Amino acid sequence: MLEKFTVIRGKAVPLRGEDIDTDRILPARFMKVLTFEGLGQYLFYDERFDEKGNPKPHPLNDPRYRGATILLVESGFGSGSSREHAPQAIKRAGFKAIIGESFAEIFFGNATAIGLPCVSLSPEDLGVLFRSVEENPELEVEIDLVNQEVRFGDRTAPLSIREEAREALVEGLWDPIGELLEAGELLDQFDQKLPYPRRTE
């Protein structure tokens, strides 16, 4: 059974900038891997480290946001290539959800398919959330997919997410391939009913 996402709680890290593309999220040279294991360490690598591997000023290097599990972004996040390595890197870096103004369509689909909810807030509510987290890095943020709202401090903001994605996340049906693999016997039964020629021994 896949995880059901109803309420996600955690500290957030604010990442400002519009139209952040997948090549910035995960530089292409780190995509030459057979599995996604370990991709989290390369998240925003070229923006976080210099050529010698020394840390640069970046929210993900800021000790105030250590342990954050929610990523705050602005509009057009995840544009660029269609590879799923970018959302995989975000998830494997320990993030459980992303809050932004808008997301690239393919990135949104890839993120949903690995159980990484991406929810949108209005520019006004997102701006308040950014400022609140920057002023208080310890602020707890709640993403309620059932009631479709984000809560932080004494504020509640309505979130938006495609209904089919929300239902899949809430019901634990977000990984279609995983669902197929778990339905082994049903698939075999269905296969036996298909009207195509079968090889006889």
From Swiss-Prot:
It catalyses: (2R,3S)-3-isopropylmalate = (2S)-2-isopropylmalate. InterPro entries: 3-IsopropMal_deHydase_ssu, Aconitase/3IPM_dehydase_swvl, AconitaseA/IPMdHydase_ssu_swvl, IPMI_Swivel, LeuD. Pathway: Amino-acid biosynthesis; L-leucine biosynthesis; L-leucine from 3-methyl-2-oxobutanoate: step 2/4. Disulfide bonds: none annotated. One of its GO terms (cellular component) is 3-isopropylmalate dehydratase complex. GO terms for molecular function: 3-isopropylmalate dehydratase activity. The keyword Lyase applies. It holds the Pfam family Aconitase_C. Heterodimer of LeuC and LeuD. This is 3-isopropylmalate dehydratase small subunit.
